[in-house]
């Protein structure tokens, strides 16, 4: 069996908006409802872009190379962008089944690259994996779940003893 390395790319333009990035930053002090709205906005935008750009579903170890592009040059703490926006972007890819899981077993996150281009704000995620699957290769929920007869069963009968 031949093992090929496949690279995929997800480019999200005009993202992240400053208000969203501030809300999701670990240093941000916002109300929980505002943080929830920001997290939901990131999940929806990433899911939509992955769907539109036909990002392939990946399994196995995936290396992710994030590139943040900002419109103006200034001092930035990139750790805040990674722990805020990038965490929720990866969570959205897991929820949409583009990634199996975001644990160390499945995802390696490389240090982010920061670029400055006047008038451009974007997040580019480059994925490198050795295993890309189509929808037909993914097991269905019925195939991977425990049979209904075994759910909730115990080795001992119920009742008083």
Briefly describe each language-model feature range:
Residues 1-161:
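Catalytic phosphate/metal-binding cores of nucleic-acid and nucleotide-processing enzymes, i.e., regions
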